[in-house]
């Protein structure tokens, strides 16, 4: 029996590198390089409540750190320390300070430190002068430079300067207008254009005429006129006399009048004596607030509502009408051959059980 040759598996680094590239990855290689073995998972679970310090306990290759392994009993004979070799001590070299090089000074040469300045045109010039002789001085005068730019004219200082400003030209935007025309058979529009002498444009006037060039539907008489049929209108349930107010009299109104009669009880309603009857009949609002007559609008059949501010109560012309916020419409009652006109008012204050306002 021939035994099959056993092929050696690739190294762990090559297998994990191929695993990263998408090849088939052995589960033991993947867990070892990703620190997901059973020992690593136990350390992760136990480390949640235990702390091992810097012991370096794991399934990887341990080196003991930079100082190597140290036994628990201290440094003894059996301890192994891995690290770098001993440091070599080198002797210190003393460096001497070097100063600047000395420059010799010769005090025997009495040279003058004054250097004469001579103007020259580029060549060498030699000046020989004897003591006591006169020296001729020649001065060259050059003309001022000529300015070739535009001439600037300066006028009177008191006059204001005038600057010519040229406006910028902007391109005109294009405007497009669209007109739509729709025919309406309800009316016929007549458009007339009026042109005046010397005018280049015409103004359009639109006239809407009812019945202009219209078509009548129906029978016509021999003269061409349309025959219309007149239908009389019948009225149903129209009272003989129209109502005098916006709210007609009804059964509900009669019940309301009976209820208002109960309000004339002295225990529930305060009765106010009217001294000026003419004002109470024509314009009763003058008892509540200061105002002027408005002849354009007078309607005494409506309820009057006054806008009173609760924080600032103003004085009324009549003390009995103080703090009135509403006056009802006039209520007419007949008793013993007389006609009584009354208005029910409502105050804005609140009265408690202790009679405090």
Swiss-Prot record:
Post-translational changes noted in the entry: Highly phosphorylated.
Keywords: Capsid protein, Cytoplasmic inwards viral transport, Disulfide bond, DNA-binding, Host endosome, Host Golgi apparatus, Host nucleus, Host-virus interaction, Late protein, Microtubular inwards viral transport, Phosphoprotein, Viral penetration into host nucleus, Virion, Virus entry into host cell
The keyword Transmembrane belongs to this UniProt entry's keyword annotation: no
Disulfide bonds: 19-25
GO cellular component terms, semicolon-separated: host cell; host cell endosome; host cell Golgi apparatus; host cell nucleus; viral capsid
Molecular function terms, GO-annotated: DNA binding; structural molecule activity
Motif (Nuclear localization signal): 1-10
General function of this protein: Minor protein of the capsid that localizes along the inner surface of the virion, within the central cavities beneath the L1 pentamers. Plays a role in capsid stabilization through interaction with the major capsid protein L1. Once the virion enters the host cell, L2 escorts the genomic DNA into the nucleus by promoting escape from the endosomal compartments and traffic through the host Golgi network.
Family: Belongs to the papillomaviridae L2 protein family.
Complex and partners: Interacts with major capsid protein L1. Interacts with E2; this interaction inhibits E2 transcriptional activity but not the DNA replication function E2. Interacts with host GADD45GIP1. Interacts with host HSPA8; this interaction is required for L2 nuclear translocation. Interacts with host importins KPNB2 and KPNB3. Forms a complex with importin alpha2-beta1 heterodimers via interaction with the importin alpha2 adapter. Interacts with host DYNLT1; this interaction is essential for virus intracellular transport during entry.
Protein name in UniProt: Minor capsid protein L2
Organism: Bos taurus papillomavirus 4 (Bovine papillomavirus 4)
Gene: L2
């Amino acid at each position: 029996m021939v035994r099959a040759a056993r092929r050696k598996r690739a190294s762990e680094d090559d297998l994990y590198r191929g695993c990263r590239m998408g090849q088939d990855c052995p589960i033991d290689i993947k867990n070892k390089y990703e620190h997901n073995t059973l020992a690593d998972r136990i350390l992760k679970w136990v480390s949640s409540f235990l702390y091992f310090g810097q012991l370096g306990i794991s399934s990887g290759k341990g080196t003991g750190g930079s100082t190597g392994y140290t036994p628990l009993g201290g440094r003894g004979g059996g301890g192994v320390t891995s690290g770098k070799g001993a440091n070599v001590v080198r002797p210190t070299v003393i460096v001497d300070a070097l100063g600047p090089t000395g420059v010799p000074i010769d005090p025997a040469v009495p040279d003058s430190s004054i250097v004469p300045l001579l103007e020259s045109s580029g060549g060498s010039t030699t000046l020989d002068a004897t003591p006591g002789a006169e020296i001729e001085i020649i001065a060259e005068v050059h003309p001022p430079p000529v300015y070739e730019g535009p001439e600037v004219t300066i006028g009177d200082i008191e006059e204001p300067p005038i600057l010519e400003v040229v406006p910028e030209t902007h391109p005109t935007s294009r405007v497009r207008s669209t007109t739509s025309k729709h025919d309406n058979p309800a009316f016929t529009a007549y458009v007339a254009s009026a042109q005046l002498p010397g005018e280049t444009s015409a103004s359009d006037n639109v006239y809407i005429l009812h019945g202009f060039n219209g078509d009548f539907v129906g029978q016509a008489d021999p003269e061409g006129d349309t025959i219309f049929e007149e239908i009389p209108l019948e009225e149903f349930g129209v009272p003989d006399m129209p109502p005098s107010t916006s709210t007609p009299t009804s059964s509900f109104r009669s019940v309301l009048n009976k209820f208002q009669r109960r309000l004339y009880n002295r225990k529930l309603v305060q009765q106010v004596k009217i001294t000026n009857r003419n004002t109470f009949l024509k314009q009763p609002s003058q008892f509540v607030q200061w105002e002027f007559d408005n002849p354009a609008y007078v309607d005494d059949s409506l309820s009057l509502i006054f806008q009173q501010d609760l924080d600032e109560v103003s004085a009324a012309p009549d003390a009995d009408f103080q703090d009135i916020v509403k006056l009802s419409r006039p209520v007419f009652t007949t008793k013993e051959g007389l006609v009584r006109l009354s208005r029910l008012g409502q105050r804005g204050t609140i009265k408690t059980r202790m009679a405090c306002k």
